[in-house]
Amino acid sequence: MNYLAGGSTVNPTEQGLNIPVDMAFAFHSDAGTTLNDSIIGTLGIYYTNVYNEEYANGASRYLAHDMTDLIQSNIVRDIRSLYEPDWTRRGMWNQSYYEARVPRVPTMLLELLSHQNFADMRYGLDPRFRFTVSRAIYK
């Protein structure tokens, strides 16, 4: 990621391919089960406490917080309105995961659902659900 953006306006301090990448996004499923097989839901992860809380272009790393909040809100709202009114928004973590810490552009890790939990996976295997989530991320 940093090599792609290196030399561009978003990462001017590193050498690279000079591609001004606006953001990095890691799409994951999480592990975990519940005793009653209820929805585990969606978690957003970002990280601010590195590089003096700034990206390479001087922008605040709190942009990742705002981006994570917007994307997670879109996803959960669309899932609740179209599929499951009780879909869980698990919160947002400001944690030092590699994928959130290293990129020099705003970054989000999305843990959409639990791949070990039937209540989550009955949606996760539905192509319409996948499209809805993808659209929610994009908009």
Regions found by a protein language model. Give the residues of each.
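Active-site-adjacent substrate-binding region
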Residues: 60-93
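Sec-exported extracytoplasmic/periplasmic mature domains
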Residues: 1-6, 29, 72-81, 138
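Active-site-adjacent mobile loop/cap segments within catalytic or ligand-binding domains
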Residues: 29-53, 83-139
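Catalytic-core regions of hydrolytic enzymes
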Residues: 1-40
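Short histidine-centered catalytic/ligand-binding loop motif
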Residues: 56-57
